[in-house]
């Protein structure tokens, strides 16, 4: 099992694009390009690491109903529009693991994180957050993802 760290995630403002549907079908590259372009047009300084916020568990939610947001941190006073919205993500305590692997390995990583959360007297207290530390790469026909998976937690 990957090493789990309990961390305090700082509050941040993000610009994001909402999605409903299969997590594997999110046009990640297109969205990130649009978000950074949007920030540049508005002369807003973006953060370096894009992120995904995932509201629904694949084990309990049909693919067509899964809600998510792909976003980037933004610094400065900026308002969203019809397509790209902005919001504050509050400060929170998270259980975090580093992930490097094919997208097909995400379920096992989430299972391991969920087990750690339960075994250590915590419960999930919000949607999971994935912070992408590197652009995905194609290796041997598979897409390799680089992310920190964060589970917002609170003591039971």
Q: What is the predicted function of each stretch?
A:
Residues 1-156:
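A solvent-exposed interaction/effector surface
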């Amino acid at each position: 099992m990957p090493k789990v760290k309990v961390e305090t995630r700082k509050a941040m403002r993000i610009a994001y694009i909402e999605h409903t549907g299969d997590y594997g079908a999110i046009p990640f590259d297109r969205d990130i390009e649009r978000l950074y372009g949007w920030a540049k047009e508005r002369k807003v300084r973006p953060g370096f690491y894009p992120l995904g916020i995932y509201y629904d568990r694949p084990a309990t939610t049909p693919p067509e109903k899964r809600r998510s947001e792909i976003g980037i941190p933004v610094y400065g006073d900026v308002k969203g529009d019809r397509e790209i919205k902005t919001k504050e993500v509050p400060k929170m305590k998270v259980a975090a693991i580093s992930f490097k692997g094919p997208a097909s390995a995400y379920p096992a990583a989430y299972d391991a994180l969920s087990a750690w959360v339960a075994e250590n007297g915590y419960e999930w207290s919000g949607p999971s957050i994935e912070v992408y530390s590197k652009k995905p790469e194609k290796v041997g026909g598979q897409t390799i993802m680089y992310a920190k998976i964060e589970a917002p937690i609170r003591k039971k």
